[in-house]
Amino acid sequence: MGCDGRVSGLLRRNLQPTLTYWSVFFSFGLCIAFLGPTLLDLRCQTHSSLPQISWVFLSQQLCLLLGSALGGVFKRTLAQSLWALFTSSLAISLVFAVIPFCRDVKVLALVMALAGLAMGCIDTVANMQLVRMYQKDSAVFLQVLHFFVGFGALLSPLIADPFLSEANCLPANSTANTTSRGHLFHVSRVLGQHHVDAKPWSNQTLPGLTPKDGSGTRVSYAFWIMALINLPVPMAVLMLLSKERLPTCCPQRRPLLLSADELALETQPPEKEDASSLPPKFQSHPGHEDLFSCCQRKNLRGAPYSFFAIHITAALVLFMTDGLTGAYSAFVYSYAVEKPLSVGHKVAGYLPSLFWGFITLGRLLSIPISSRMKPATMVFINVVGVVVTFLVLLIFSYNVVFLFVGTASLGLFLSSTFPSMLAYTEDSLQYKGCATTVLVTGAGVGEMVLQMLVGSIFQAQGSYSFLVCGVIFGCLAFTFYILLLFFHRMHPGLPSVPTQDRSIGMENSESYQR
């Protein structure tokens, strides 16, 4: 009860910035899930081949990773962070508005690269601001943050669905199976098997399509609707920024991010309160910079090996789990329509929505659970659940019912892994390392690499390899998590004093002492 009261008190003191950071992650979610269902329409719009349109995915993921790594540049002050979030969320609305006018695949790839940069910046900055505000109490707020990702990712396919073209924009003399709307590798693999003597249309550029086909114009409405829905988000950031810049008339006002720490200080003995009057620390946190600054910090020279091992193993866990999230959502449709399941294309189209829907539900359920369960326990349950679910799917690979149940189960188990791992790692390192930047970067790399790797294996080995990859990557995630627990036990930074005292002590020590 006391913990819940403290958390609710923290939320009341930081309500506006917290709601703003949550809404910014809604923009992130909107932008992360719309490419899959709109792929065929965008391909028709740009008159491009499958290998050409695949660069759109790559450009978004690569720039998302780059934006995550460089996001720390904008975290040095609160004003920089808010300006970065305002620019990024506004850029996402502009991207949605501009996509219908991209008639060339290179232009579309460039636009999606801009979206990726904005998403990466949002990912790093919003996560870090919440961790910086709430520190040891950040687990609950991170769960809500990532709930908004799932909500946005669930909403964007639902918005796009009524506007997707049912017509086939392929040449009339093509005998290709065009019903596999969602995925590049599925179509190219099927065509490669069934049309050995013919040149597959996946390597051909579509002939010019006249505007009469409407394949580009109908889906344009979906993008414009998403642009309008997202528009209040940059406005909310601008309101918070203007509120932060008001104190020209009242210089006594302190930064918004300080209130959570003031509340923590109120529970300390008087001598500790007097010793920690360091508000500038919260304007520029030395422990939370961009990836390159973290790697070059001189005050990490004395850190024990376990300090670096915790960073690496935690990032590897998220490399696997976030990579599985991206790969499963991208290829579950292709797996379902293939033999032995041969699910109807319309029915299979519900699988990605089911997956993201249960991710959203899982993040919603994790909000109250995270206030009563340790982040380490939640991550353990999640990773074990992922492995068990993939094993069940592999054993019952001929059963469509198990595919739908397993998809929902995977969504639940993967939903809270990232925020729980972030809260656990930051607390293990006493908020002194570069955990947020490293973990966000590791998750971004995993989402990009595993999606490409699973797609290549799927194309070469067949649909059964999809579940085998899931089992392997799930087991690797579990192995890395066990190693993380081991290094956490070995870490000399584990004090016997309460966590609350640690959150204060970390302000007075910027480097490890051997």
Curated annotation (Swiss-Prot):
Under the heading Gene3D superfamilies, the entry gives:
MFS general substrate transporter like domains
Where in or outside the cell it occurs: the entry states:
Membrane
Query: Mostly located where?
Result: membrane
A Pfam family matched in the record: MFS_1
GO cellular component entries = membrane
- Membrane topology value: Multi-pass membrane protein
Report the superkingdom from the record: Eukaryota
A molecular function (GO) term: transmembrane transporter activity
Q: Which residues cross the membrane?
A: 19-39, 53-73, 82-102, 107-127, 139-159, 221-241, 307-327, 347-367, 376-396, 400-420, 438-458, 466-486
The UniProt entry, under CDD domains, shows:
MFS_MFSD4A
Give the record's glycosylation annotations as residue positions.
Answer: 177, 203
Q: Which UniProt keywords apply?
A: Glycoprotein, Membrane, Transmembrane, Transmembrane helix, Transport
Family membership noted in the UniProt record:
Belongs to the major facilitator superfamily.
List the PANTHER family hit by this protein, alphabetically. Answer: MAJOR FACILITATOR SUPERFAMILY DOMAIN-CONTAINING PROTEIN 4A, SODIUM-DEPENDENT GLUCOSE TRANSPORTER 1
Its name, as the record gives it, is Major facilitator superfamily domain-containing protein 4A
Q: Which gene encodes it?
A: MFSD4A
